[in-house]
Amino acid sequence: MDLPGPIHDFLLVFLGSGLLVGGLGVVLLPNPIFSAFSLGFVLVCISLLYILSNSHFVAAAQLLIYVGAINVLIIFAVMFMNDSEYSTDFNLWTVGNGITSLVCTTILFLLMSTILDTSWYGVIWTTRLNQILEQDLISNSQQIGIHLSTDFFLPFELISIILLVALIGAISVARQ
């Protein structure tokens, strides 16, 4: 969207904080229904971020596929689960939680150091060369492919990681 700078920055901070709050809700809420609704909120915030960055097609695909199909499927599956195991015995901290938090914290600091040490100047020039190449393309699907592999590479990969985690979680729930 072509918004003035302060409004764009405010919406960016607002949606980013919504992502953080929703992500914490997914992880920390003990009731799986509330966690699934929080995941839906996170996915809607991501699609609004796509709209904010002028990628309306990806935002529509995000809403239709992830919020409209996958999140509804997760909520449907959670509602069929037996909720007695969540209400009776709820341990606040286990060894597995400690190991998981240690691994996630390590990955977070590695990602932060990688982001801070990356020369973003070269990435900007690569993007500009792709924009020059994009003017010669005829097909919109080719333009979408170029945007997904350059401008929106990180969000696209994050969405694929979220799907992978959801599949692993579904498999582990099905085994129990």
Curated annotation (Swiss-Prot):
Keyword Repeat belongs to the record: no
Assembly with partners or alone: NDH is composed of at least 16 different subunits, 5 of which are encoded in the nucleus.
Record keywords: Chloroplast, Membrane, NAD, NADP, Plastid, Plastoquinone, Quinone, Thylakoid, Translocase, Transmembrane, Transmembrane helix, Transport
GO cellular component terms, A-Z: chloroplast thylakoid membrane
EC number(s) given by UniProt: 7.1.1.-
Gene Ontology molecular function, alphabetical: NADH dehydrogenase (ubiquinone) activity; quinone binding
InterPro entries to which the protein is assigned, alphabetical: NAD(P)H-Q_Oxidoreduct_6, NADH_UbQ/plastoQ_OxRdtase_su6, Nuo/plastoQ_OxRdtase_6_NuoJ
Membrane topology listed for this record: Multi-pass membrane protein
Protein name: NAD(P)H-quinone oxidoreductase subunit 6, chloroplastic
